[in-house]
UniProtKB/Swiss-Prot annotation:
InterPro entries: HisE, PRib-ATP_PPHydrolase-like
GO CC terms in record: cytoplasm
Designated gene of the protein: hisE
A single GO molecular function term of this UniProt record: phosphoribosyl-ATP diphosphatase activity
Compartmental location: Cytoplasm
Record's protein name: Phosphoribosyl-ATP pyrophosphatase
Length: 103
């Protein structure tokens, strides 16, 4: 099991946890909209670090983005396995062809 899979399992386990005992549980308790807002904030921070060119800071912010993506997905009951299956479905397809195939 990869670190991303372990993190996704931890996020899923926190769905029923006491919001006072877990940051993840607190985010999930605040609903999908708050989870999406936090994801957006972290994405912007990653973009800023990408522009600045600080590799270590970008890696740190990218880790935050991945965590908050998993929380946002969990808030809408979308699993990492579903996302991975979609990536596998797209694998080997050019981006132009994949986008055209969406309709």
């Amino acid at each position: 099991m990869s670190v991303l899979e372990r993190l996704a399992a931890t996020v899923e386990a926190r769905k029923g946890a006491d919001p006072d005992s877990s940051w993840t549980a607190k985010l999930l308790a605040r609903g999908p909209e708050k989870c999406a807002e936090k994801f957006g904030e972290e994405a912007v921070e990653a973009i800023i670090e990408a522009v600045r060119g600080d590799r270590a800071r970008l890696a740190s912010e990218a880790a935050d983005v991945l965590y908050h993506l998993l929380v946002m997905l969990a808030a809408r009951d979308v699993t990492l396995a579903e996302v991975m299956a979609e990536l596998e479905r797209r694998e080997g397809t050019s981006g132009i062809a994949e986008k055209a195939g969406r309709g």
